[in-house]
């Protein structure tokens, strides 16, 4: 199952919780990157994309409810 389909099955509350956790992780990754302690720099991109995916799924649900 793809990440997008897994996210689409989650509730809005679960998506919000996951997004908050990802924002915290992104903050920590940026801090580690700035202090040259980050080994896996590709994780920054992965986290950014997961946040974008969650925002997209939430937006799709809001648009669907308005119709």
UniProtKB/Swiss-Prot annotation:
Keywords: Ribonucleoprotein, Ribosomal protein. It comes from the Bacteria. GO terms for cellular component: cytosolic large ribosomal subunit. GO terms for biological process: translation. CDD domains: Ribosomal_L29_HIP. SUPFAM superfamilies: Ribosomal protein L29 (L29p). GO terms for molecular function: structural constituent of ribosome. NCBIfam families: L29 (TIGR00012). Belongs to the universal ribosomal protein uL29 family. This is Large ribosomal subunit protein uL29. It comes from Magnetococcus marinus (strain ATCC BAA-1437 / JCM 17883 / MC-1). The lineage of its organism: Bacteria, Pseudomonadati, Pseudomonadota, Alphaproteobacteria, Magnetococcales.
